[in-house]
Amino acid sequence: MIAILMGGNSAERAISLKSGEAIYQTLNNQNIDCFTFDWYGDNLSEFWQQEFDQVFIILHGRGGEDGYIQKQLENRGICYTGSDSNASHNSMDKARTKIIWEQHSLTLAPSIIANIDQPINPINFPLPWAVKPTLEGSSIGISKVDNQMQLNDALMLAWQYAPYALIEQWIKGDEYTVAILGDKALPVVRIITDQNFYDYESKYHSNKTQYLCPCNLSLTQEKALQAIALKAFFAINAKGWGRVDFIINQHNKPYLLEINTVPGMTSHSLVPMAAKAIGISFNKLVTSIINEI
């Protein structure tokens, strides 16, 4: 029996519920015994009373991608999809992720950390800047700062979601993402949005966002991006499945943005799109993720 653990209490709850329902439908259609559990508020104690052998974690954001639920399952000896608690913890914290990636000589935008309780260190890289909470996904709480006067409002927004914010040099360029399944990188997807960046609205509600797969990179460029994505994925000790996001600037230099250890699985989601490009159906994708346990 597979428990599909969805919902959660993060800002990405609504997306998790959509993802969980899609996974339930595909497993149910294949006559695989499964059920969904909507974690909401403090009802997790009810989950542990259910009978199941494995857990498909489709919780996005805090609680689901930060190692909390993974640690709970590990302590109970229960198998689950995706990365373990340590890798999840490291990947959820954007600042921690950057430190690990820098240790592996991966290319990142210059940045500093801004603590809500401390004065901000001098920013020694040029405007514009991206200001983002260290502990949220789906581009929640992110602002583009074009001048110094906008910085305070951007920090106040980011600090609503986490006590630390990342101030990062804004890299102008095209956004790409690489899905990982097992030890393989799937085809690269290019993201084109009419917004300043690929924000929450662009990801989940806009019909103007375009996704290109094939991504219009040369074969050499695509293979290079896939190789960087795999290096970034394994540097965090991630496993099973995930997604690594990039920006490629006007000089064709790729910069890592972030890693997602529990990406979305909705109709707008990019992992199913990349899988479909090489003939992997949604049914096959879901069962492949389970087989990676």
From Swiss-Prot:
Its EC number is 6.3.2.4. It is found in: Cytoplasm. It catalyses: 2 D-alanine + ATP = D-alanyl-D-alanine + ADP + phosphate + H(+). Binds 2 magnesium or manganese ions per subunit. It holds the Pfam family Dala_Dala_lig_C. Disulfide bonds: none annotated. InterPro entries: ATP-grasp, ATP_grasp_subdomain_1, D-Ala_lig_Van_CS, D_ala_D_ala, Dala_Dala_lig_C, PreATP-grasp_dom_sf. Mg(2+) 1 binds at D245, E258. Cell wall formation. Belongs to the D-alanine--D-alanine ligase family. This is D-alanine--D-alanine ligase. It comes from Vesicomyosocius okutanii subsp. Calyptogena okutanii (strain HA).
